[in-house]
Amino acid sequence: MAVKTINVNKDILGVNEALALNLKKAFEINNTFVINLMAAPGAGKTSTILRLIENLSADFKIGVIEGDIASDVDSRKIQERNVDVVQINTDGACHLDANMITAACSGLGIEGKDLVIIENVGNLVCPAEFNLGENIKMMILSVPEGHDKPLKYPLMFTESQALLINKVDLTPYTDFNMDEFQKTVRAMNPGIKMFPVSAKTGDGFSELTEWIGQQIKAAKKMNGSSK
């Protein structure tokens, strides 16, 4: 008698995909644009969110879902900006999944929100595998991490629709090769939109903010909303 083998990873991803589809429908009904923000620890996810809140909150109602293995340090920073935020602590899991986001949305209340930013757990591998019902996957690569990261961690670079190259103000102090980096990424993902930025100084955020605003408005128009 043959031994039956079960592909656990495939089953998990299948269940997640079904839940993510339900989330996507809910977001569309509410005309809520969702960004799944992914990066390694320390790349500048929370700093980027704070900049986006500063630049976008005058025109759009924003909510944030914070994902961390432990603590609510980042959520408190968001809360200080008078933005609705829900904290997810995964207690060891290296990524968020659609089930976690479903629960978080109940606490956040997506009704009336134009934009929800999901800060995924700091990791360059697992988060890219799990659909959260988002409109776009946006990743951050910070200059100190090195220009070779697309070759070492290709999945996130190929799955993302937008890439922020953060901490460009530190470029003179590293051997980061911007041209080589962008060439590598373009070969892997020709359609990706890249933004060299500094969350610390604000450089590059005008273009990024304008682009996100355009994406939000385009999604609303596609959903038949004039709001």
Q: Over which residues does each language-model region extend?
A:
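Residues at the C-termini of beta-strands that transition into short coil/loop
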Residues: 89, 141, 198
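Canonical P-loop GTPase G-domain recognition
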Residues: 170-225
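Iron-sulfur (Fe-S) cluster-binding modules
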Residues: 1-15, 19-22, 170, 200, ...
